[in-house]
Amino acid sequence: MEYRDFVEQVKEQIQDFLPEKFADAAVEVNQIVKNNDCVLDGLMVRTEESNIAPTIYLNPYFEQIQDGAELDDVLAQIASVYQSHYIDHDIDVSAVTDFDKIKEKIVCKLINEEANQQFLQDKPYSKLEDLAVVYQILMDKTGEGTATITITDNLMDGYGITLEELHDQALQNMDTLQPHSFKGMNETVAEMIAVDIAREQNVGMDEAKEMAMQMMPDIPDTMFVLTNDTKVNVAAAILNDDIRQEIAEKVGDFYMLPSSIHETLIIPKDAGMEFKELEQMVQEVNQTQVAPGERLSDHVYEYDAKEHELFRSDRAEERAKQKEEKRDNRHERVSVKEKLAEKKDAVIKMNAGKEHSVPEKKKEAVI
């Protein structure tokens, strides 16, 4: 089956796999530019009871067909995912034009700037090294995912605020809307194993996690996971300097590995790993395990807790050189100021000496 035939089959048959209330729904498939300028086909099934509808991207489901899955099984899976994200009531989307109404719902999303040139054309964004920070309105959040609206230049013009104000507002909202967690890899793996233990042995999650932790090797963690409660757009958490400082208090200066836009790994700098080794690992993982639409960067970043700065590790020497030049320039400016001050003092003293000196009396001639 060709991909376009698959899309048409889904569009024509999806309602057969949905409840009766979707029988009269309008079914459409639209092409949508997503992260890294990936163009995906999004399925939407619109009903009269709700003014919004989930978008289900069909591209990954076709991969299942290519792997031998039956079309009916894939359609049933799409229908199940759709229903889990479906909202059965209207949402006041007109509020998105009023900054005061949506300011406490704004969140950040971190993406690669170069890979998103088309996507960024009509979006306000901030820059961090080779990354771009875009802003979204979090309309809804469930255990299955989130519903967001990306802020465009048109929306931004109506808000009447600066980009800096938008960025600050999004950072303020992060811990409320997307609470973060920072855990060692041992604990993270144990939690994954605990799910299977709880199901297979019919025990509670707390007991299952305790059992899983006993299976973990008794060695210190050298790798940590930064995540949030939705497991979506996790990389944006590193934008918050309070979070970075919290991590640094536990592990010191650290490397940040952008596993994807949804996952971030933290490795202490004193763990003995070189950034070039880590960068090679990131690049290999991106090429073999991360979907193109979820890749963030091929580079490794590091955090200087003393300076409160996050920067690309391959630019560390350049950064150090620039800081040294700035220090030299400041020293030079100070030296010039000191010399000028010394000359000024000398002139003042010289003038003061002239004003207070007593002129010598002329001798009278004796005739």
Question: Where are the regions a protein language model picked out?
Answer:
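Alpha-helical oligomerization segments
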Residues: S260-V334
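Short glycine-/aliphatic-rich beta-strand segments at the starts of folded cytosolic domains
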Residues: I219-V234
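Extended, low-hydrophobicity segments enriched in charged/polar residues
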Residues: D5-D218
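Short amphipathic alpha-helix segments
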Residues: A235-A248
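Non-Sec secretion/translocation targeting segments of pathogen effectors
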Residues: R327, H331-I367
